[in-house]
Swiss-Prot record:
Cellular component annotations (GO), alphabetically ordered: synapse
Primary role: Plays a role in skin pigmentation by antagonizing the action of melanotropin alpha. Induces melanin concentration within the melanophores. May participate in the control of the hypothalamo-pituitary adrenal gland axis by inhibiting the release of ACTH.
This protein's UniProt keywords: Cleavage on pair of basic residues, Disulfide bond, Hormone, Neuropeptide, Signal
Record GO terms (molecular function): melanin-concentrating hormone activity; type 1 melanin-concentrating hormone receptor binding
Disulfide bond keyword on record: yes
Name recorded for this polypeptide: Pro-MCH 1
Family: Belongs to the melanin-concentrating hormone family.
Residues in the signal sequence: 1-24
Amino acid sequence: MRHYVLSISFAVALFLECYTPSTAISIGKMDDVALEQDTLDSLLSVEVSENSPDSVRGRSSKIVLLADSGLWMNLNRGLPFYKLRAAAAGPDRALTLDRREAGQDLSPSISIVRRDTMRCMVGRVYRPCWEV
C-alpha cells in the first residue's frame, strides 16, 4: 500500500510540475516568449528551424507513465496476477504432485507437493519470486 501511495503522490507532483508554469505565465510574458522565439528563428537558418522537433520549437504536452509492482495486483481480490490465474484454474490444479523414482531411495513412492510459483531469473538461476 505504501508503494501505491508513493507512486500516486509522485505522479501528481510531476503532473502539477508540468502544468504549473503554463498556468502561471501571464499574457504579457507569453508575448515576450513568442518574440524571443521569432528572434531565435531569424538567427537560425531556415533548414535548422524546419527540421527541429516540435518540442524544441514550442512546448508540447508529455505523458508520463509510472510502473509499479502493484499493477500486477488484481484490484478486486488483492492477489498477484499469477496467483489469481492459478486460483481461477481450480484448487485441484493449484498444487502439482511430483513422484521421484530412485532405485536406492528407501521409499521411492513418496509424493512431493509443490506450489505453483512464479519464477524470476536472478543472475543466471531461476528462483521463486516473492511478493513485496
